[in-house]
Curated annotation (Swiss-Prot):
Subcellular location: Periplasm
Annotated organism of origin: Enterobacter sp. (strain 638)
Protein's UniProt name: UPF0194 membrane protein Ent638_1286
Primary residence: periplasm
Family statement drawn from the similarity comment of this UniProt entry: Belongs to the UPF0194 family.
Record Pfam families: HlyD_D23
Cellular component, GO, one term: periplasmic space
Amino acid sequence: MKKPVVVILAVVVLLAAGIGGWLWYQSQQDRGLTLYGNVDIRTLNMSFRVGGRLESLAVDEGDTVKSGQLLGQLDKAPYENALMQAKASVSVAQAQYDLMLAGYRDEEVAQAEAAVKQAKAAYDYSQNFYNRQQGLWKSRTISANDLENARSSRDQAQATLKSAQDKLSQYRTGNRPQDIAQAKANLEQAQAQLAQAELDLHDTTLIAPSNGTLMTRAVEPGSMLSAGSTVLTLSLTRPVWVRAYIDEPNLSQAQPGREILLYTDGRPDKPYHGKIGFVSPTAEFTPKTVETPDLRTDLVYRLRIIVTDADDALRQGMPITVKFNDGEGHE
């Protein structure tokens, strides 16, 4: 009876030891996961939104650049002239719109009334003259050509009278709503052109959008530039990201926010610290830059690791050894 019991106990002990060993192995695998990556290369091509002659550049390759720093200047003269012209156009349009809103002065109405009286008198005279010419033509005293001349004079006087009457009516009732709306639209168009001219002048200066190091100075002062052509290339130094790749079996270990240890060849005993900031939702074939041979034919997921204690020793493109810690700051 004792022998079967001993056998059963031995089997239980072996199973427990096996399970414990497997769990220990898995924990060591998790703690020992190592990836290889590089400090992400992040550059910004800077250009002027408008074209023109490059007047000056204030930086050279290798210079440290601060956000908001003046980097370059185009010749401002053409844009200053355009701004002056736009301001003048706004003044003209504003004056015209104000006139439309104000209507006509009493003096203008009085002048229009006088013009109507004068045109009416001229029309009455031409009508009476035409009537007399008709009687003379019937008695064969004048020719048909004389009668036609009298009719033309009468019709011209009638048209002049109607024009004067229409003008007087307009002066008395004010400008039509359509004319006022047109004047307002002209003013708004001029104001928009002024705003564009101000923006164009502002954009003749090139301002650093971020801290960084100047990598490339593509042109020199005196060059004629088209809008959008690259002038300077800036290497963005903050924040520092490390790009690495992980295979699917280990993907569960790469959770956003997980703390990571980062080693460089120059300081193998003093790691940088980082956190996983992004895990790609889609797999891709391993890029050629990955140094681990057994991953080069696999589908992997890209990781972005944010370095939390970066310094100037971390240069873009530098190879990095990525080691996952156990969550307590230990490798």
